[in-house]
Amino acid sequence: MANIQDFLTDNMLSNLESAASLAIHSKNNEVVPLHLLWALSVDSTSILNQILNKLNISKEALELEIKSRISKLATSSNVNRENIRFSNELINSLENAKGLMSANGDSYLSVDTWLISESQKSPIKEILAQFLDLREFQKELESLRAGRKMDSKTSDETLDSLNKFGIDLTLKASEGKLDPVIGREEEIERLMQILIRKTKNNPILLGEPGVGKTAIVEALAQRIIKKDVPKSLQNKKVIALDMSALIAGAKYRGEFEDRLKAVVNEVIKSENIILFIDEIHTIVGAGASEGSMDAANILKPALARGELHTIGATTLKEYRKYFEKDAALQRRFQPVNVGEPSVNEALAMLRGIKEKLEIHHNVTINDSALVAAAKLSKRYIADRFLPDKAIDLIDEAAAELKMQIESEPSSLRKVRKDIETLEVENEALKMENDEKNQKRLDEIAKELANLKEKQNALNSQFENEKSVFDGISAKKKEIDLLKNEASLAKARGEFQKAAELEYGKIPSLEKEVEILEDKWKKMSENGVLLKNQVDEDLVAGILSKWTGISVQKMLTSEKQKFLEVEKHLKESVIGQDKALSALARAIKRNKAGLNADNKPIGSFLFLGPTGVGKTQSAKALAKFLFDDEKAMIRFDMSEFMEKHSVSRLLGAPPGYIGHEEGGELTEAVRRKPYSVLLFDEVEKAHKDVFNVLLGILDDGRATDSKGVTVDFKNTIIILTSNIASNAIMNLSGKEQEDAVKNELKNFFKPEFLNRLDDIITFNPLGKDEAYEIVKLLFKDLQMSLENKGIKASLSENAALLIAKDGFDPDFGARPLRRAIYDLIEDKLSDMILADELHENDSIIIDAKDDEIIIKKA
């Protein structure tokens, strides 16, 4: 046995071990050639099965014949790994194959050599002859070998490399497994133009992730099947190379190179294969180790001679990183730039794949849902690209609906749970036999009868709806298959078959679908348990889960929303009508498209004394625009007073501690691209902070320390400052305006001030505003009390007293909040702790003799 192992390939040895396991399973005390043939037939990746698939021969029939013959062999009850042995017949079989191996000039015996040897004589020849033509079988085995020598134990792993390490996209296209590709005509034409060149006929598709590079290659495969390509490309096959499969399991040095070289040789020999390598930058350095070449260097000679037709695909970033450094590799590929499609182009692509998505998910997708997916994904998902993000959105919306359809309807689930609850109660009451319980048992019996009747009715309705639903889905799938068959028939010139399908079977099925859809429509009018329409609300709901932005805000008309911005701000901020009007006007200008597209939504400098509503305005704006006060990201600029602290905004440079964490500003915006950025007390910051802000205000983006560009176009930037507070407090009109301008010019650089959309002055508050602010602040206290079940109201006298006692023009509105704490909340907390206030109580907060009194209503 040891001598036999020395000349067997690893694959052959593995199959012999499988044969021994099968012999033990069959209780045969010897391993014979039949066991080895059986082992090959059950291994789906074996050479035997590859040939059976090519020749369209049933492996199940072959397996039955083998098992039938094995059942006639001698058996033993105590066969195990220790006492199983190779029969003389098998050893002779391997020795005979070894002779053929030597004649072929091989150093090791592989499975294909053994099969050729056995198909010339022996009982195995009789079995194979029942199912296939032996000459054709031997010819296919020799074709797989393609003249290669078995000079290592792993050499036969490279047989039929393209089947092992590649995916035939033209085969997938012929089976209708690829989605239709809409648009991209220019890129596909350029791709074909490069492919039919004499040399350097290798295009490389360059574009951002998700723009549709792979889809362009799939479109080429579909065109080849339909013969919609130049004559020189009509018989080509597009094979996608699976780099992970190529590298996986390559245990020994040189094994990866052997596999890749085998693939290259197969492609060169066939002359009709176009190799597609997605993420082609992975070949640079792949397999390289001390004393061995990387994959790129193996491909270069064949690429330069034009013997290897290759299409690559990678991103611009990876192309610059890997290809531009290797000039020899770069010049062997011709770039084809694939840009991000517009919203309208992405919408056309979505409409193209709509039918496939509907068939897969068994739902109907409204056109409004496609429009919403294209527009909302463009607006709200800034770090990804069309059409991928829009396709993902519509696909997930359809998946959510499919999950609902395949689950028990909520109304049916509720009835079932009610029945279960009553049955549990029924069993519990039966244990206690008294008059009161008997009365309740009678009630439960009636309720259960009603619920079970309702459950039966709902079940019946659900089954009827499901049968119509499944019928529509099955017919649509059949139509899709027939359409693909008709398309292939046309490409093959079988016009009679195409006509039979297009004018016979397909219209007949479409009529059946129409009848079922009419039936569904009538059922829908009476109310249905199953929802089968993917609409814009569902799409917006999915996007809301992704981004955290409210669904209602997405679907509200943008114009209508921004027309109301001033009104909403004035509800939250008191006494700053002029400042809020200026803020609202600037935002409306931006949203009307009168500002540059590459800038933030708005950038403002809020000036004014403390406590006048600068920060509150920013919070109110965040709440209105993004439906969440937490959408305001606040930076206390007193933390950035020193030069070294400025790097915290964009991140520490490479080599410094904290580099991997990124910048506080850039990371915050990457996580929440739709937000209000508040830079509080900006005059305290180091002057270098303003250099960082210049680029953001001008271009709407910033590059962090890791080289990642962060988009600020969906943010509102607000800077607050107490500069010129004295002038604002003590002056008014033109005099105030001039004094403020002079102080700003003395502190800020002109280029910084020029980049701001507006400088907004917040004026000091008066006693009238203080009264309104007290009423606004009291609403927060009211809500807290309502959560405890206590209703509270504030009298006018009490509000006036709090405004009088708490207002200080030098400190603005902040002392008013402290006055509410001192005058109201302290007394309320004492009453609650003393059990003087309970749930469902109502109180009135009033004032008498300059003192706040709290009384129950």
UniProtKB/Swiss-Prot annotation:
One GO location term (cellular component): cytoplasm
Region spans: NBD2: 558-764
Cellular compartments annotated: Cytoplasm
Binding positions for ATP 1 per the UniProt entry: G207, E208, P209, G210, V211, G212, K213, T214
Region (Linker): 341-548
A GO term for molecular function: ATP binding
All residue ranges annotated as the Clp R domain in the record: 4-147
Segments for region (Repeat 1): 8-73
Matching PROSITE patterns: CLP_R, CLPAB_1, CLPAB_2
Annotated stretches, region: C-terminal: 765-857
Annotated region (NBD1), positions in chain: 160-340
Superkingdom classification of source: Bacteria
Reported function: Part of a stress-induced multi-chaperone system, it is involved in the recovery of the cell from heat-induced damage, in cooperation with DnaK, DnaJ and GrpE. Acts before DnaK, in the processing of protein aggregates. Protein binding stimulates the ATPase activity; ATP hydrolysis unfolds the denatured protein aggregates, which probably helps expose new hydrophobic binding sites on the surface of ClpB-bound aggregates, contributing to the solubilization and refolding of denatured protein aggregates by DnaK.
UniProt-recorded name of the protein: Chaperone protein ClpB
Record organism: Campylobacter jejuni subsp. jejuni serotype O:2 (strain ATCC 700819 / NCTC 11168)
